[in-house]
Amino acid sequence: MIDKRDDKPFKLKSKYKPSGDQPQAIESLVDNIEGGEKAQILLGATGTGKTYTMSQVISKVNKPTLVIAHNKTLAGQLYGEFKEFFPDNAVEYFVSYYDYYQPEAYVPSSDTYIEKDSSVNDEIDKLRHSATSSLLERNDVIVVASVSCIYGLGSPKEYADSAVSLRPGQEISRDTLLNQLVDIQFERNDIDFQRGCFRVRGDVVEVFPASRDEHAFRVEFFGDEIDRICEIESLTGKTIGEVDHLVLFPATHFVTNDEHMEQSIAKIQAELAEQLQLFESEGKLLEAQRLRQRTEYDIEMLREMGYTSGVENYSRHMDGRSPGEPPYTLLDFFPEDFLIMIDESHMTMGQIKGMYNGDQARKQMLVDYGFRLPSALDNRPLRRKEFESHVHQIVYVSATPGEYEMSQTNTIIEQIIRPTGLLDPEIDVRPSMGQMDDLLGEINQRVARDERTFITTLTKKMAEDLTDYLKEMGVKVKYMHSDIKTLERTEIIRDLRLGVFDVLIGINLLREGIDVPEVSLVAILDADKEGFLRNERGLIQTIGRAARNVDGHVIMYADKMTDSMQRAIDETARRREIQIAYNKAHGIVPQTIKKDIRGFISISKTSHNDISKEEMDYESMSRGERKEAINALQKQMQEAAELLDFELAAQMRDLILELKLMD
């Protein structure tokens, strides 16, 4: 039995106190949640401390909370911040555990079957298990997740019911415990003791839970009774302390008992017979043979091992769901009365909507050509409507809320004041005629003041032409486009901040990590060309890039005033007015944000006599040197992950993948 602790409150620890309009935003959000409001929007301008406000709300409403971000990097940053704010509570991280993932697919035009290929990140897998076990054991839980949280995960009831509960004095034989551990997918390994394994030494069983990476547990028997349970260091075996209750959750999220497994296999066999009959009636003998061979192999593995590669494709039968019924996801592990916060909701909600369609198109091809049973289509992400059905209370957080969020609620809480007193930038609209000369003059003014400039264009060609022109004029300039890899992008931003060059040109400079306090000018070319990057939301996001500097200024080059431009200008002016009034009333002098410049990733290069640290020329390396570089990077990636620097770890991961592709 799981003893769930539901009385521990969230305890926020911070050297800051709410300032600006944070107190009003926190109070309004909390009052609305306690008053039963289902949905509300926190409209927070860039740099106003939205994460701190979210933390204050969580600590006051005291509900288990799911925070969803639109990518792993952002989720990692939020996870680190929440860990600092809530050191005594369970802050968990739940994202896709694949470092590399090539989904199973079939291309009929070339008769090419692509086997599923993936590389699982052991650290993230541990964190996922930690998240689900925390949700079943306690109430003071914050899970920071990417949209992976809407993908199928296995039944929380089966997961909880399969848990092995142990206490000192409990009557259970050693062999019974070993059988129970095997049933929940733990492996016996007396030599290489790692997560998801157990080892046996006489009357002592040591178990390494899937949710830990340093500490394991030692269960000591006296006859058919547990004498003592100790927490131990997994590496040295040193005892940390005794525990009076140990719950061991399954080593995989897809788990089922023997009786249920036989029922599931019977359903899989019935579906197989039905699909084979259909293929044979249509004369698709190759597809029928393929499906029979693959499915019968999987059934044999399930029967003998309780697991098979691609077991998730049979999740509908394992969970006992009807065709078309939504899969179990992380959301089902939460209690009914939980809170959802959607960070950067204008991006994240679009992702939640789009996940289902892309997944179904690929899987339908596998079903049509006999690679999978039709039930594989039910191993899928949630549809948006299904996601909505899980929502008890939700807060959308964004500087520019999308149409979807606005359609869900009329309750909008604004957070416009920055703790630094910084104002939204002033905006000029200038004609496109003569824009190059005008822009060059503005750039030179910034260079003279040791400030930087962002220029955003609409096309790759224009960005390239503008880069060439400014170089001819003696400006130190770089162009950042979509082909540039993650690590190189980080290096470019660092060089911009250090003053290696003064101007950065790009098409979409809204990506995370592009907040540069040294940028005092943002120039928007073709501002009057309506579209994704020139709509109201896109313009406000771009304008926000200049909001980190006290001299922040935006120039829109356009021949006409579009509705989007006018709305973006009006909204920025409205916010600026509020900020000026607040600063005046409280005697605040705006200050440019101070932000440390992180060093570029470098690895050790070994020569015959010495080791020097320098940036590597990977292209000219031999295969052996690249292998050494990969090993060094993997070590640094693990160190970064242990320090909770997931942004750095993700950059390392991307570089490792690039190096592997060179071979």
Swiss-Prot record:
Record-level GO BP terms: nucleotide-excision repair; SOS response
Gene3D superfamilies recorded: P-loop containing nucleotide triphosphate hydrolases, UVR domain
Residue stretches making up the UVR domain: 627-662
Residues annotated for ATP binding in this entry: G44, A45, T46, G47, T48, G49, K50, T51
Keywords, alphabetical: ATP-binding, Cytoplasm, DNA damage, DNA excision, DNA repair, Excision nuclease, Nucleotide-binding, SOS response
Motif extent (Beta-hairpin): 97-120
Residues annotated as signal peptide: none
Residues in Helicase ATP-binding domain copies: 31-418
Composition bias type Basic and acidic residues, residue spans: 1-10
Cited function: The UvrABC repair system catalyzes the recognition and processing of DNA lesions. A damage recognition complex composed of 2 UvrA and 2 UvrB subunits scans DNA for abnormalities. Upon binding of the UvrA(2)B(2) complex to a putative damaged site, the DNA wraps around one UvrB monomer. DNA wrap is dependent on ATP binding by UvrB and probably causes local melting of the DNA helix, facilitating insertion of UvrB beta-hairpin between the DNA strands. Then UvrB probes one DNA strand for the presence of a lesion.
Similarity comment: family membership: Belongs to the UvrB family.
Name by which UniProt lists this protein: UvrABC system protein B
Gene name for this UniProt entry: uvrB
